[in-house]
Amino acid sequence: MPVEEFVAGWISGAVGLVLGHPFDTVKVRLQTQSTYQGIVDCVVKTYRHESVLGFFKGMSFPIASVALVNSVLFGVYSNTLLALTATSHQERRAQPPSYTNIFIAGCTGGLLQAYCLAPFDLIKVRLQNQTEPRMQISSSMPRYRGPVHCAASILREEGPQGLFRGSWALVLRDTPTLGMYFVTYEGLCRQYTPEGQNPSSATVLVAGGFAGIASWITATPFDVIKSRMQMDGLKGRKYGGMLDCMASSFRQEGIGVFFKGMTLNSARAFPVNAATFLSYEYLLRLWR
């Protein structure tokens, strides 16, 4: 099993994570808290209350963990295509796989990534939702003092299953969406690359960016439910399950609730995924 795709996926995931984390923090807060009137209000209040560091809450853990999970996505995707088509990453430019095989490989990578990602993503979301200012008196210390303390607290208060809260919504978000993600990327690369050649850096940037936007537009409804399920249990159980969360959210806030954060997701998706694919493709070419 080639391991280059796993390593390239980890490094490219870290690059994308650093670029996108501030957007992700604002998005998560909009989806899970009702104290903000919109994107600008959330950005202003976060900066005023917590300084610029507030936008990077919860990032230290994903740098080591979520970036590693990204290696699972790219590694499983590439190796699934290898199993389906018997062609390596470089050979696929001369012998392009079918879009059906690309979709299957993307869904497989998305499914396995979701299960690996669930505990790490939950901890990230909990940390991002802490809105205490950095300089504060000792009597109002944040609930979680860091990722390790957060994980230990969840295990103690909610049990092992607490770390996988919202995992079904995460699976439903990532499995078909990441199939579409790779289909969009490969389709755009083929459209603007001469047959048998590698796509240019500009093509990779544009294809990766639009693949990210397309996938997040379809993923946002389950992303909202995922974030709300992950915050459930922090102050008592509010939802009886994923379907109850969907029904309750719709009943209280209308259909628009399922698209909270979509503008931010789309704005974040282009630069993050453009950088992710560019670094991924560059590393694979460098090593081969």
From Swiss-Prot:
The keyword Transmembrane helix applies. GO terms for cellular component: mitochondrial inner membrane; mitochondrion. It is found in: Mitochondrion inner membrane. The chain crosses the membrane at residues 6-26, 58-78, 102-122, 166-186, 202-222, 266-286. It is a multi-pass membrane protein. Solcar repeats lie at residues 1-83, 97-191, 199-286. Its main location: mitochondrion. GO terms for biological process: transmembrane transport. Keywords: Membrane, Mitochondrion, Mitochondrion inner membrane, Repeat, Transmembrane, Transmembrane helix, Transport. The keyword Transmembrane helix applies. InterPro entries: Mit_carrier, Mitochondrial_Carrier, Mitochondrial_sb/sol_carrier, Mt_carrier_dom_sf. Widely expressed, with highest levels in testis, liver and kidney and low levels in brain, including cortex, cerebellum, hippocampus and hypothalamus, and heart. Gene3D superfamilies: Mitochondrial carrier domain (1.50.40.10). Belongs to the mitochondrial carrier (TC 2.A.29) family. This is Solute carrier family 25 member 45. It comes from Mus musculus. The gene is Slc25a45.
